[in-house]
Swiss-Prot record:
Gene: CDK20
UniProt source species: Homo sapiens
Catalytic reactions on record: L-seryl-[protein] + ATP = O-phospho-L-seryl-[protein] + ADP + H(+); L-threonyl-[protein] + ATP = O-phospho-L-threonyl-[protein] + ADP + H(+)
Protein name: Cyclin-dependent kinase 20
Keywords: ATP-binding, Cell cycle, Cell division, Cell projection, Cilium, Cytoplasm, Developmental protein, Kinase, Nucleotide-binding, Nucleus, Serine/threonine-protein kinase, Transferase
InterPro entries xref list: CDK (IPR050108), CDK20-like_STKc (IPR048002), Kinase-like_dom_sf (IPR011009), Prot_kinase_dom (IPR000719), Protein_kinase_ATP_BS (IPR017441), Ser/Thr_kinase_AS (IPR008271)
Length: 346
């Protein structure tokens, strides 16, 4: 740490504390993520190892945050990243109104280029959300925080935990306890982020997993084996029954959004993971080639992380799984009235 001068604290994520720092010799500004170990014999935490492995296995890409160095410090170690001025969550919080369509297209285009690059390298991020999409001083968006990333198995033979992705951006198969999944979980998250940019607020702001499913089925309708054949194979299928809910047209959810945007959004927000549009294919969608065209990064808003007015939106949800099947319904739900219309009695 002697080679760096700490300039301030940026924040604290699920996988470590992040500081803004300056390299003493070169003057380069970086972001230092300090990861502590409880005991030296523990070795590196799995999530930290995944982040290092994922970033080191991928060649430099302008849409993925650059890992510059890794070094031990005290009872842990430090990751040195290129410094990014802000993140997409701050952009949404500080926007006085929904972003201009050209701005939404630009952010989404950069996100899709980063996701396409990750998926081409067999990396599933598993925690895409606005707070993990960093913004540089020049307006460039880059994907960060690969602490939950995994190299996925194309043949679907590997089992993974379903407790990944922040709840508002968590794919339905994860909410149903899926242990076998692929890049489709990232594509659902991209759809949620796109919807949030178009709407100015999250589409599915559930306070627990059941409420999250209720928000989803209120728009997509109640899932069934005819629409989603793999549904019956999921571990948590039939643990709770939902009333039949017909899909809501996206033009009613987002009445001021263009047909092209709604068409692309609808191709991300699909129950069957294999039917969701791939990031590389989405980049060729007519949405990006109709007026207004994507804005140049220099035309995008860049709010500061520190200082400025207090954010209007409340903090995002935690990663923890706070619904228990055996617990009484009223004890598991923060807002029972919101989901009661969707739940079958008895």
């Amino acid at each position: 740490m002697d080679q760096y001068c700490i300039l301030g604290r940026i924040g604290e994520g699920a996988h470590g504390i992040v500081f803004k720092a300056k390299h003493v010799e070169t003057g380069e500004i970086v972001a230092l993520k300090k990861v502590a170990l409880r005991r030296l014999e523990d070795g590196f935490p799995n999530q930290a190892l995944r982040e290092i492995k994922a970033l080191q296995e991928m060649e430099d890409n302008q849409y993925v945050v650059q890992l510059k160095a890794v070094f031990p410090h005290g009872g842990g170690f430090v990751l040195a990243f290129e410094f990014m001025l802000s993140d997409l969550a701050e952009v949404v919080r500080h926007a006085q109104r929904p972003l201009a369509q050209a701005q939404v297209k630009s952010y989404l285009q950069m996100l899709l280029k980063g996701v396409a690059f990750c998926h081409a390298n067999n990396i599933v991020h598993r925690d895409l959300k606005p707070a993990n999409l960093l913004i540089s001083a020049s307006g460039q968006l880059k994907i960060a925080d690969f602490g939950l990333a995994r190299v996925f198995s194309p043949d679907g033979s590997r089992l993974y935990t379903h407790q990944v992705a922040t709840r508002w951006y968590r794919a339905p198969e994860l909410l149903y306890g899926a242990r076998q999944y692929d890049q489709g979980v990232d594509l659902w998250s991209v759809g949620c982020i796109m919807g949030e940019l178009l709407n100015g607020s999250p589409l599915f702001p559930g306070k627990n997993d059941i409420e999250q499913l209720c928000y989803v089925l209120r728009i997509l309708g109640t899932p069934n084996p005819q629409v989603w054949p793999e549904l019956t194979e999921l571990p948590d299928y039939n643990k709770i029954s939902f009333k039949e809910q017909v899909p809501m047209p996206l033009e009613e959810v987002l009445p001021d959004v263009s047909p092209q945007a709604l068409d692309l959004l609808g191709q991300f927000l699909l129950y069957p993971p294999h039917q969701r549009i791939a990031a590389s294919k989405a980049l060729l969608h007519q949405y990006f080639f109709t007026a207004p065209l994507p804005a140049h990064p220099s035309e995008l808003p860049i709010p500061q992380r520190l200082g400025g007015p207090a954010p209007k939106a409340h903090p995002g949800p935690p990663h923890i799984h706070d619904f228990h099947v055996d617990r009484p319904l009223e004890e598991s739900l923060l807002n029972p009235e919101l989901i009661r219309p969707f739940i079958l009695e008895g």
